[in-house]
């Protein structure tokens, strides 16, 4: 707002009475990964994708010229949602509005209405609109959302982002100067650059917040769809560099998430390496993947001009960097994967006898509802898988862990849970006699009730926001299925220890389920292979 005022502009008031339909915008592109173990993985990460997209297309309320009326797109999304899809699921597989796609395909038989910012409207064929944007010397840019911007003047938002981006670069440079020399100064400048990074990334969120004066769904959705289109190009171009095919889900592409691409050239080169026709090492792989990242960066200005009519100078702000090179990786589903990387941003980490470092995303070994002992065990198993340990050895280690875990008392086999709204549910139950609530809240309420029934004034009472350990119970006279005790309770009362804990059920939930979540994609059937109930059969088999 201050920046706009300094330019002599008047900022409009906030829009009122907007429905969800007016504010919902398509989200980021997240691909389904090619599940399983992959070798020699590289990743390219686009620098500040959303802020860069806003700058590259000069997006701002004051630079909007018009909007392709999204009749076809809205109809498609509504039809999908009518069939039960969520708004996000309805956008699955789409990288742009149908109107934008029709324009880029220069479809002569498709008529599209343009709503001009001055209040007028005109109807054209998609082919005519393409010519209007790309072949008429107009200073116009067309976003993947079908929004037309002008680049005659720099908008306030891209101008701010440009300044913040330059300031962050300076702060990062100062942080690097102090790294390893002055910890206090390094931490200071590192935190400063982090704050600036948050500013850069949060501005996109503000544009999509109805409470923001700069709110405009056209800009917000233009940002995400342009981001999707750029990510699709990056994936397709990486695959073209490796296989010769411009395909965003080609043979070399493992996974894509918002602004990053995970790929491997190994399946295409493995035969040549094994036959001795090509040398292969970590150094060779790093050099190859650096070269691919450089080629992708060289492609961006031309792509931005071809896809959006963004001038090459503006399109050049889209840049990617080769982030990691990993020896192996395990990909499970969207947002859940782990890689053992040997190089990060041209800095080797497989030194001093170490195989590298593990980068894990969305796995149970990092979740707060997984017991610490299970987190540590899952980390150990994951490391074994990523370093090439054979199935038989992993099965033996899981079985060994299960025996140790079986010997632990029942109350140590529960799952950590945070209890919220306990007071609300308790009052609701007092008022109605019976209330529906999350299982872990019911378990906490059971602890409080049993504590009162045993006249226990020494044990802690569970209150709102407290962390608990939820333990499952066998059939009992009270009809309870679980109980949750406070994690900070240092001395568990005897009445609690005497409860009929369902050890088997907890072992299945805490061990078998967590292992299956991590390694199920490998198809190793670990549950039956490590079933401790089969011990007698495995020890005494008669043929």
Task: Show the residue positions of the predicted features.
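Non-transmembrane amphipathic alpha-helical segments
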Residues: 161-178, 196
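Flexible hinge/switch segments at interdomain interfaces of large molecular machines
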Residues: 203-212
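A generic structural motif
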Residues: 259-263
């Amino acid at each position: 707002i201050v920046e706009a005022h300094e330019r002599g502009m008047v900022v409009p008031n906030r829009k009122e009475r907007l429905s969800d339909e007016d504010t919902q915008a398509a989200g980021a592109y997240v691909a389904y990964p090619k599940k399983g173990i992959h070798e020699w993985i590289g990743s390219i990460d686009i620098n500040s994708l959303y802020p860069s997209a806003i700058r590259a297309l000069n997006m701002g309320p004051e630079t909007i010229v018009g909007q392709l009326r999204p009749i076809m797109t809205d109809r498609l999304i509504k039809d999908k949602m009518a069939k039960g899809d969520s708004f996000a699921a309805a956008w699955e597989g789409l990288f742009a509005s149908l109107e934008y796609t029709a324009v880029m395909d220069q479809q002569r038989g498709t008529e599209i209405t343009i709503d001009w910012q001055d209040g007028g409207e005109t109807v054209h064929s998609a082919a005519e609109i393409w010519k209007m944007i790309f072949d008429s010397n107009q200073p116009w840019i067309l976003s993947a959302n079908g929004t037309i911007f002008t680049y005659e003047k720099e908008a306030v938002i891209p101008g701010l982002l440009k300044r913040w981006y330059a300031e962050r670069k300076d702060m990062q440079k100062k942080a690097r100067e102090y790294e390893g020399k002055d910890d206090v100064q390094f931490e200071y400048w590192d935190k400063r650059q982090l704050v600036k990074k948050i500013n850069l990334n949060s501005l996109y969120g503000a544009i999509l917040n109805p409470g923001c004066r700069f709110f405009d769904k056209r800009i917000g959705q233009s940002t995400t769809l342009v981001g999707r289109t750029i990510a699709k190009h990056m994936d397709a171009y990486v695959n073209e560099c490796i296989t010769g095919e411009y395909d965003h889900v080609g043979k070399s592409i493992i996974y894509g998430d918002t602004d990053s691409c995970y790929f491997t050239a190994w399946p295409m080169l493995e035969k040549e390496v094994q036959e001795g026709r090509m040398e292969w090492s970590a150094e060779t792989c790093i050099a190859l993947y650096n070269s691919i990242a450089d080629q992708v960066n060289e492609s961006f200005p031309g792509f931005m001009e071809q896809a959006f009519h963004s001038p090459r100078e503006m399109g050049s702000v889209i840049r990617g960097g080769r982030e990691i090179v990993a020896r192996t990786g395990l990909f499970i589903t969207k947002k859940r994967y782990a890689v053992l990387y040997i190089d990060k941003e041209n800095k080797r980490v497989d030194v001093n006898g170490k195989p590298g470092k593990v980068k894990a995303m969305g796995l149970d070994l990092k979740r707060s509802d997984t017991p610490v002992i299970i987190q540590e065990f899952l980390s150990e198993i994951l490391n074994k898988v990523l370093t090439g340990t054979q199935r038989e050895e992993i099965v033996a280690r899981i079985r060994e862990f299960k025996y140790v875990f079986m010997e632990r008392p029942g109350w140590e086999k529960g799952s950590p849970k945070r209890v919220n709204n306990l007071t609300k549910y308790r009052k609701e139950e007092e008022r109605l006699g019976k209330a529906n609530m999350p299982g872990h809240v019911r378990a906490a309420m059971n602890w409080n009730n049993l504590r009162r029934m045993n006249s226990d004034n020494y044990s802690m009472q569970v209150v709102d926001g407290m962390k608990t350990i939820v333990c499952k119970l066998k059939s009992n006279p009270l009809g309870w299925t679980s109980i949750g005790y406070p994690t900070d309770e240092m001395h568990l009362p005897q009445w609690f220890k005497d409860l009929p804990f369902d050890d088997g059920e907890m072992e299945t939930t805490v061990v078998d389920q967590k292992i299956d979540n991590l390694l199920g994609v490998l198809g190793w059937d670990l549950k039956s292979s490590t079933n401790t109930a089969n011990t007698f059969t495995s020890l005494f088999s008669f043929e």
